[in-house]
A protein has these predicted regions:
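Long, aromatic- and glycine/proline-rich binding clefts that accommodate carbohydrate-like moieties
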Residues: 359, 407-478
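Periplasmic solute-binding protein
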Residues: 146-149, 155, 172-217, 263-286, ...
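Extracytoplasmic "Venus flytrap"/periplasmic binding protein-like
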Residues: 95-168, 182-184, 199-205, 209, ...
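Extracytoplasmic/periplasmic solute-binding protein
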Residues: 61, 179-188, 192, 220-289
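Ser/Thr-rich, Proline-interspersed low-complexity disordered segments
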Residues: 35-69
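Extracytoplasmic/periplasmic substrate-recognition and gating elements
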Residues: 73, 102, 106-108, 180, ...
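Glycine-centered hinge/linker elements that transmit conformational signals in sensory
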Residues: 233-237, 271-274, 285-321, 350-352, ...
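A structural signal for short loop-to-beta-strand junctions that line the ligand-binding cleft
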Residues: 126, 133-134, 161-201, 260-262, ...
Length: 506
């Protein structure tokens, strides 16, 4: 199993989205290398064209470049630890390389494409033989953590070139900061938001979820309550309905015949599911001891109770049933009232109808955490030419960013490009000339969520990454498919099993 498998679903989603993202070619849609469902129906729409705004120029070398006496410096760009090796993407990448080389005679940029399934082993071999590349990408957190500790701190290069980091939101910038420094610069980002179906709220007289962070929620009795997971539970139960029209709070409700669910968490990775309750990581400060953040333990128990006791969240068998999208994001069936998800779900949410909207992520213990995914290009510590590599990096993130974001279906991290992205979405039409997206989606909610990105990120490094993902998947499957478990015991067993795997990896 690939050690970045926690992001496999998202990467497969983003790769396959290229085919179905005839829907949103603004940045061609949304789904590029970080975690999404394995299979989702292809929207029946015709191809469209659009592009993000031209990138804001940043500091660039002054004066014309000349070829150094020894010839141009070779910089190798390695792909594809995630997205990037679809034929349509490769042609764009080769054009980007050609364009760069035509403008930079002092540097020869070489593109190395390795298919996703073999990329990790290939990069490991190259690094082991001291023949590694200079730049790797696009790569998400999971892919980069497979090579933890090998990424260059860009702080001095940013200062030296006066590279303008203010063009990105502070939350996005901080996302790439770690104990090792600024190990990345924002490129394509995927913030979280709450998708919801207004008609389901209207049907039973409920107010819609808040659209501004910090707002309270008005309950049916007029009381104002915090927008948190307790509120989500209450609303979720009222919005869960069986075939006889009873909701999950009523006597006679039949949990075996539910036709509409109230809430669906982002369950691609149980670390990510828990991150909505608080940022954290499984590795303690010493890098070798397993820790289960308190917020994560609470999140898993809340999720389990929501499936098996309160019945407002789908169990695994329901989630994987054909009636609820066969393991894909079930909100997109139009049978779920609310769902937390990343922005890449915009690609396929069209199947949920033409009247959905976006609300804010709820808080836990008074704090909002909106799980976050992001892709970028990184420079390896082993590069012999950091200055030249950084010049290439600036080009990929600057002049070439429009072409690459379009090819990778990425939402731009550069704030000046984000508004155009949503404008183009609103202009998309299906084969019959009807708008694909609802006319008044509150896209600002998605951008506002960036400031609440989970840091440390849920995909952060842990020992025995490969084996650990297997263990996490095993427990996730067990919890989703088995009622009556003692979750305190389950979480303790998970911790013990992870620790055993970590200890044996040294």
């Amino acid at each position: 199993m690939d050690p970045t498998r926690s992001s496999d679903r998202e990467r497969r989603h983003k790769a396959s989205t290229k085919a179905r993202l005839l829907v949103l070619l603004v940045v061609v849609g949304l789904a590029a290398l970080a975690c999404g469902p394995a299979s989702t129906p292809v929207p029946s729409v015709g191809p469209t064209t659009a592009a993000v705004a031209s990138p804001t120029p940043t500091a660039a070398p002054s004066g014309p470049e000349t070829i150094p006496p020894g010839g141009p410096v070779t910089i190798k760009w390695f792909c594809c630890l995630g997205t990037g090796n679809d034929p349509s993407q490769v042609s764009v990448e080769h054009q980007v390389v050609a364009d760069f080389n035509a403008k930079h005679p002092a540097i020869k940029l070489v593109f190395e494409e390795v298919s996703y399934t073999g990329a990790r082993d290939a990069l490991s071999t190259e690094l082991g033989s001291k023949a590694g590349p200079d730049i790797v990408g696009p790569v998400g957190v999971g892919g980069s953590e497979a090579f933890h500790g090998q990424w260059l701190d860009l702080t001095s290069l940013i200062q030296q070139t006066k590279y303008d980091m203010s063009q990105f939101g502070q939350g996005a910038n901080d996302f790439f900061k770690s104990s090792e420094g600024q190990i990345g610069i924002p490129f394509a980002i995927y913030p979280s938001e709450l998708y919801y179906e207004p008609a389901m709220f209207d049907e039973i007289g409920l107010k819609y979820p808040p659209h501004q962070y910090g707002q309270q929620y008005q309950m049916p009795d007029g009381s104002m309550v915090d927008w948190n997971y307790d509120t989500i539970r209450q609303l979720g139960m009222q919005l869960t309905v069986d075939k006889n029209g009873n909701d999950a709070t009523q006597a006679g409700f039949d949990p075996k015949s539910i036709v509409q669910y109230g809430f669906e968490p982002q369950r691609d990775d149980i670390r990510g599911l828990a991150a909505y309750f608080g940022a954290g990581q499984l590795a303690a400060a010493d890098g070798k001891t397993v820790q289960i953040p308190d917020a994560w333990a609470y999140a898993w128990k809340w999720w389990y109770q929501g499936m098996w006791t309160d019945h407002f969240i789908e169990t695994g068998p329901v989630y994987n049933s054909t009636a609820f999208n066969g393991g894909g994001y079930t909100f997109n069936t139009g049978k779920v009232a609310m769902q937390e998800n990343f922005l890449w779900n915009v690609c396929c949410v069209t199947d949920a109808g033409r009247h959905w909207d976006l609300g804010t992520i709820p808080s836990y213990n008074g704090k909002v955490t909106a799980a976050f995914n992001a892709d970028t290009f990184r420079i390896l510590k082993s590069t012999k030419h950091p200055n030249e590599a950084f010049e290439v990096l600036q080009y990929l993130l600057g002049d070439a960013s429009t072409k690459l974001l379009n090819a990778y279906s990425g939402f731009p991290a550069r704030t000046t490009d984000q508004g155009n992205f949503f404008t183009q979405l609103e202009q998309q039409k299906d084969a019959k000339g009807k708008p694909i997206y609802p006319p008044n989606v509150d896209w600002k909610v998605a951008v506002d969520g960036i400031q609440f990105a989970d840091n440390p990120n849920f995909e952060a490094f842990m020992p025995a990454y490969n084996k650990s993902l297997d263990i996490l998947t095993k427990y996730s499957t067990r919890w989703q498919s088995t009622p009556g478990l003692n979750m305190d015991t389950e979480i303790a067993n998970l911790k013990t099993e992870l620790q055993t795997a970590w200890d044996s990896s040294h």
